[in-house]
Amino acid sequence: MSIVFQFFLIALVLFSLLMVIGVPVAYASPQNWDQSKPLLYVGSAIWAILVVAVAILNFLVI
């Protein structure tokens, strides 16, 4: 169970770093807003799912 928790935690950290770089770039380019809007919504949903998964796994591991 600890390995699964560590995998999800690393995925959350790396995805958060990706979002920190990607979201401002997507907002700064108005010509691609229609293309990047669904990608931002999907990325935000994945990030929220990872946060909930890490919280649940943290409860189970500790």
From Swiss-Prot:
<feature type="transmembrane region" description="Helical">
    <location>
        <begin position="41"/>
        <end position="61"/>
    </location>
</feature>
<keyword id="KW-0604">Photosystem II</keyword>
<keyword id="KW-0472">Membrane</keyword>
<dbReference type="InterPro" id="IPR036512">
    <property type="entry name" value="PSII_PsbZ_sf"/>
</dbReference>
<comment type="function">
    <text>May control the interaction of photosystem II (PSII) cores with the light-harvesting antenna, regulates electron flow through the 2 photosystem reaction centers. PSII is a light-driven water plastoquinone oxidoreductase, using light energy to abstract electrons from H(2)O, generating a proton gradient subsequently used for ATP formation.</text>
</comment>
<keyword id="KW-0793">Thylakoid</keyword>
<dbReference type="GO" id="GO:0009539">
    <property type="term" value="C:photosystem II reaction center"/>
</dbReference>
<dbReference type="InterPro" id="IPR002644">
    <property type="entry name" value="PSII_PsbZ"/>
</dbReference>
<keyword id="KW-1133">Transmembrane helix</keyword>
<dbReference type="GO" id="GO:0031676">
    <property type="term" value="C:plasma membrane-derived thylakoid membrane"/>
</dbReference>
<comment type="subunit">
    <text>PSII is composed of 1 copy each of membrane proteins PsbA, PsbB, PsbC, PsbD, PsbE, PsbF, PsbH, PsbI, PsbJ, PsbK, PsbL, PsbM, PsbT, PsbX, PsbY, PsbZ, Psb30/Ycf12, peripheral proteins PsbO, CyanoQ (PsbQ), PsbU, PsbV and a large number of cofactors. It forms dimeric complexes.</text>
</comment>
<protein>
    <recommendedName>
        <fullName>Photosystem II reaction center protein Z</fullName>
    </recommendedName>
</protein>
<dbReference type="GO" id="GO:0015979">
    <property type="term" value="P:photosynthesis"/>
</dbReference>
<dbReference type="GO" id="GO:0042549">
    <property type="term" value="P:photosystem II stabilization"/>
</dbReference>
<dbReference type="Pfam" id="PF01737">
    <property type="entry name" value="Ycf9"/>
</dbReference>
<keyword id="KW-0812">Transmembrane</keyword>
<comment type="similarity">
    <text>Belongs to the PsbZ family.</text>
</comment>
<feature type="transmembrane region" description="Helical">
    <location>
        <begin position="8"/>
        <end position="28"/>
    </location>
</feature>
<keyword id="KW-0674">Reaction center</keyword>
<keyword id="KW-0602">Photosynthesis</keyword>
